[in-house]
Amino acid sequence: MSKRVIYTSIFGAYDKPTEQSSDGWDWKCFSEENSTPLYEDNNRNAKKFKVLPHRYLQDYEYSIFIDGNMDVRGNLDELVDKYLSDKNVAFFSHNNNKLDARICPFKEAQTIIDLGNKNMKLTPERGILNYKDNPYLIQEQMNKYAMLGFPRNNGLITGMVILRRHNEKDCIETMEDWWKEIKYGSKRDQLSFNYCAWKNR
């Protein structure tokens, strides 16, 4: 059987992960305890491992990333067989979120900005901390995508779980592009993945 790993990445002790166990799957947790942080931003430190498993988990054919506050239930082999039988990357769709369904990164960006504006009225003393990320950076990134022809309503991932055959060429290219968008643009990774997938189609 091919080598398989389930992993998470946590910097800044936001979550306390429970070691996940599943037959035939190894467990890894990247954190400041075993990895040197490169950025002042803990979010980006964690995202680097989330997005780039081909750099850190080369010995594994399959990987499943999960957010640090999640638990694994069910058969992971069945999940991989179902969703990676003819693809190298699989996410859950944000449109399946019953409380907050969306299929468009542009709408997601506007929702983040609107929520920050609302919070700013309630707690102006918090300033930019009212926003999940810098609203000017988010808007600039969305303007760039629109200018490059990225269509609206072209799908929106939720990034809490990612299934990958991460050493495949198309997966590596898309993940490297995604990391550049997160590194130099918004740390809100769901804003940029669908653009990167569209760019690498």
Predicted regions located by residue number:
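N-terminal anchoring/stem segment of glycosyltransferases
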Residues: 1-62, 184-188, 199-201
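Short beta-alpha junction loops
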Residues: 12, 33-34, 70, 94-98
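Structural motif
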Residues: 9-12, 68, 165
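Short active-site loop/helix that positions an aromatic residue
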Residues: 54, 77-81, 196-197
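Conserved donor-nucleotide/metal-binding helix-loop-beta segment in metal-dependent transferases, i.e.
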Residues: 72-115
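Short beta-strand-to-loop acidic/aromatic patch adjacent to the donor-nucleotide binding site
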Residues: 61-70
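Catalytic core and acceptor-binding pocket of nucleotide-sugar-dependent glycosyltransferases
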Residues: 121-201
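Low-complexity, serine/threonine/proline-enriched polar segments
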Residues: 104-132
